[in-house]
């Protein structure tokens, strides 16, 4: 009798354990999973009827005052940010470095003419020149970036409806859209400068927005991981600064029809 009771108790215990496992499994299946959220994207203002425009990125100059800033690493982050712009393609940084070596600019560029030569050599519609103005990898990090965009006239327009102006074809370099031939203008079409201090709450807010769709919500650090890693912070800073540059491009092209009206 005692043996039978012992066996019965074991059966009851096993049945209870099995029931608990079933309930736990059901709860796990019904538990809401971390929803996927698409990250924010940058959209270019350029006319896409002829395909994406092509940019080249020159490794930024290190003007931060510290030797630990790597221009090539920051340049790669800028290239990655440009690649994420809808309507824009970007050449790999190594392609640009090879072009600089072939043209004798391995020590860096000194004038806008140097940037133009590199862009013409690569067949790019635009070339992005920049500098690292601040670099502090310690928590909270700081990164300053300045970017200047040089563009081939006619290659980065908002619309193709503008009529051809024969006077513009013989004019000297002026502003975008009214210069001669396919040469690059002497001045950048858009310039931005950002100093992103990780202690600044506005910068933290921008980093959190950038992390949306790019980080795990259930992780311990969540969006703050972009403040804890200088590599990730550099990705954020490059994306933020490139986004500001595109904002300037939207404004520039919004003003373009008014400036071209005299030639219609």
Question: Where is each model-derived feature located?
Answer:
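Short, solvent-exposed beta-strand/turn "edge" segments of beta-rich domains on protein surfaces
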Residues: 120, 136-138
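Solvent-exposed coil/turn segments that connect beta secondary-structure elements
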Residues: 60-63, 95-96, 132-135, 146-155
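N-terminal segment of the mature soluble domain
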Residues: 54-57, 65-129, 169-177, 238-251
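Alpha-helix termination/capping residues and helix-transition junctions
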Residues: 21, 49, 121-124
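Hydrophobic residues positioned within well-ordered beta-strands of beta-sheet architectures
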Residues: 128, 143-145
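Bacterial N-terminal signal peptides that target proteins for export
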Residues: 2-15
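C-terminal/domain-edge helix-coil "capping" segments
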Residues: 27-51, 138, 142, 153-264
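Bacterial N-terminal signal peptides
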Residues: 13-24
